[in-house]
Amino acid sequence: MAIERNDISDPAFESVIFQYLQDFGFAPERRGDLVHLSGVGVGSGDNSVDIALNLVEMDGHRILEVSSELRAPGVSFEKAMTIAAQGNLSCVTAKFTPVENLEQGNHSVRAGQVLYADHLSGDELKAMLYLFIKEVDAIDNVLVDMLIN
Protein backbone atom coordinates (compact mmCIF):
# COMPACT_ATOMS: atom_id res chain seq x y z
CA MET A 1 0.00 0.00 0.00
CA ALA A 2 1.33 3.43 -0.96
CA ILE A 3 1.90 6.06 1.69
CA GLU A 4 -0.51 8.95 1.32
CA ARG A 5 0.86 12.50 1.48
CA ASN A 6 -1.50 15.12 2.93
CA ASP A 7 -0.76 18.83 3.05
CA ILE A 8 -1.64 19.97 6.57
CA SER A 9 -1.70 23.22 8.48
CA ASP A 10 -0.53 23.47 12.08
CA PRO A 11 -0.33 27.16 13.05
CA ALA A 12 1.37 26.42 16.39
CA PHE A 13 4.11 24.30 14.77
CA GLU A 14 4.54 26.78 11.92
CA SER A 15 4.96 29.59 14.47
CA VAL A 16 7.73 27.62 16.20
CA ILE A 17 9.50 27.03 12.86
CA PHE A 18 9.06 30.71 11.97
CA GLN A 19 10.63 31.74 15.29
CA TYR A 20 13.52 29.28 14.86
CA LEU A 21 14.24 30.78 11.43
CA GLN A 22 14.23 34.31 12.85
CA ASP A 23 16.54 33.17 15.65
CA PHE A 24 18.91 31.72 13.00
CA GLY A 25 19.12 35.17 11.37
CA PHE A 26 16.74 34.57 8.46
CA ALA A 27 13.87 36.86 7.45
CA PRO A 28 11.08 34.32 6.88
CA GLU A 29 7.79 35.22 5.21
CA ARG A 30 4.45 33.44 5.42
CA ARG A 31 2.68 32.68 2.14
CA GLY A 32 -0.44 30.71 2.90
CA ASP A 33 0.61 27.66 4.88
CA LEU A 34 4.19 27.85 3.52
CA VAL A 35 7.16 29.58 5.10
CA HIS A 36 9.52 31.19 2.57
CA LEU A 37 13.15 32.27 2.74
CA SER A 38 14.39 34.43 -0.13
CA GLY A 39 17.95 34.96 -1.35
CA VAL A 40 19.77 32.80 1.17
CA GLY A 41 23.19 31.18 0.89
CA VAL A 42 26.11 29.76 2.84
CA GLY A 43 29.84 29.86 2.18
CA SER A 44 31.10 30.57 -1.32
CA GLY A 45 27.67 30.68 -2.95
CA ASP A 46 25.96 33.84 -4.10
CA ASN A 47 22.88 33.79 -1.84
CA SER A 48 20.65 32.84 -4.76
CA VAL A 49 18.53 30.19 -3.07
CA ASP A 50 14.82 30.70 -2.39
CA ILE A 51 13.33 28.12 -0.03
CA ALA A 52 9.80 27.03 0.80
CA LEU A 53 9.02 24.97 3.89
CA ASN A 54 5.79 22.98 3.89
CA LEU A 55 4.34 20.76 6.61
CA VAL A 56 2.76 17.52 5.41
CA GLU A 57 1.47 14.36 7.04
CA MET A 58 2.45 10.87 5.89
CA ASP A 59 1.13 7.74 7.53
CA GLY A 60 0.42 9.59 10.79
CA HIS A 61 3.78 11.40 10.93
CA ARG A 62 4.54 15.06 10.33
CA ILE A 63 7.18 15.76 7.68
CA LEU A 64 8.71 19.15 6.92
CA GLU A 65 9.37 19.46 3.19
CA VAL A 66 12.15 21.88 2.27
CA SER A 67 12.28 22.83 -1.42
CA SER A 68 14.00 25.27 -3.74
CA GLU A 69 13.14 25.90 -7.40
CA LEU A 70 16.13 26.69 -9.60
CA ARG A 71 15.84 30.22 -10.99
CA ALA A 72 15.74 29.42 -14.69
CA PRO A 73 13.33 29.43 -17.62
CA GLY A 74 11.36 26.28 -18.36
CA VAL A 75 12.97 23.58 -20.50
CA SER A 76 12.11 20.24 -22.06
CA PHE A 77 11.57 17.16 -19.90
CA GLU A 78 14.80 15.61 -21.20
CA LYS A 79 16.88 18.64 -20.28
CA ALA A 80 15.22 18.91 -16.84
CA MET A 81 15.99 15.21 -16.20
CA THR A 82 19.63 15.71 -17.20
CA ILE A 83 19.98 18.70 -14.86
CA ALA A 84 18.27 16.84 -12.01
CA ALA A 85 20.63 13.88 -12.51
CA GLN A 86 23.66 16.19 -12.43
CA GLY A 87 22.38 17.81 -9.23
CA ASN A 88 21.84 14.40 -7.63
CA LEU A 89 25.37 13.29 -8.56
CA SER A 90 26.80 16.44 -6.97
CA CYS A 91 24.80 16.66 -3.73
CA VAL A 92 24.28 14.48 -0.67
CA THR A 93 21.36 16.04 1.22
CA ALA A 94 19.52 17.83 -1.60
CA LYS A 95 17.61 15.70 -4.09
CA PHE A 96 16.76 17.22 -7.47
CA THR A 97 13.61 16.41 -9.45
CA PRO A 98 12.04 17.75 -12.63
CA VAL A 99 8.71 19.55 -12.16
CA GLU A 100 6.12 19.78 -14.93
CA ASN A 101 4.66 23.25 -15.48
CA LEU A 102 1.35 22.41 -17.15
CA GLU A 103 0.33 25.98 -17.99
CA GLN A 104 3.64 26.79 -19.69
CA GLY A 105 4.09 23.37 -21.28
CA ASN A 106 7.64 22.98 -19.97
CA HIS A 107 9.64 21.72 -16.99
CA SER A 108 11.72 23.23 -14.20
CA VAL A 109 14.03 21.64 -11.62
CA ARG A 110 13.47 21.61 -7.87
CA ALA A 111 15.88 20.70 -5.08
CA GLY A 112 14.24 19.12 -2.06
CA GLN A 113 14.84 17.61 1.33
CA VAL A 114 12.48 16.15 3.92
CA LEU A 115 12.82 16.28 7.69
CA TYR A 116 10.96 14.15 10.21
CA ALA A 117 9.02 16.82 12.11
CA ASP A 118 7.28 14.97 14.95
CA HIS A 119 10.22 15.73 17.26
CA LEU A 120 12.19 18.35 15.31
CA SER A 121 14.56 20.44 17.42
CA GLY A 122 15.88 23.87 16.55
CA ASP A 123 19.46 22.57 16.39
CA GLU A 124 18.45 19.79 14.02
CA LEU A 125 16.55 22.20 11.76
CA LYS A 126 19.48 24.64 11.75
CA ALA A 127 22.02 21.94 10.83
CA MET A 128 19.92 20.41 8.05
CA LEU A 129 18.97 23.79 6.56
CA TYR A 130 22.64 24.80 6.62
CA LEU A 131 23.64 21.67 4.69
CA PHE A 132 20.77 22.01 2.20
CA ILE A 133 21.37 25.70 1.53
CA LYS A 134 25.14 25.21 1.25
CA GLU A 135 24.76 22.41 -1.30
CA VAL A 136 22.11 24.11 -3.41
CA ASP A 137 23.80 27.53 -3.34
CA ALA A 138 27.11 25.96 -4.38
CA ILE A 139 25.70 24.21 -7.47
CA ASP A 140 22.61 26.15 -8.54
CA ASN A 141 24.45 28.54 -10.87
CA VAL A 142 26.16 25.63 -12.66
CA LEU A 143 22.83 23.85 -13.08
CA VAL A 144 21.07 27.02 -14.28
CA ASP A 145 23.84 27.56 -16.85
CA MET A 146 23.26 24.00 -18.07
CA LEU A 147 19.52 24.67 -18.28
CA ILE A 148 19.96 27.87 -20.29
CA ASN A 149 22.68 26.63 -22.67
Predicted features, each with a name:
Residues I63-S108:
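Short, internal acidic amphipathic alpha-helical interface segments
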Residues T93-Y130, V144-I148:
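Well-ordered alpha/beta subsegment
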Residues A2, Y130-A138, L143, N149:
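Long, contiguous binding/interaction regions
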Residues M1-A52, A94-K95:
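Charge-rich, low-complexity N-terminal segments
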Residues D7, P11, E78, H119-K126:
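Ordered, soluble secondary-structure elements with a strong preference for glycine-centered loop motifs
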Residues G43-P73:
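Long, continuous compositionally biased terminal/linker segments
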Residues A27-D33, E57-G60, V99-G105:
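Short, ordered beta-strand-loop transition motifs
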Residues G41, S68-L70, Q113-A117:
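Short beta-strand-to-loop capping motifs
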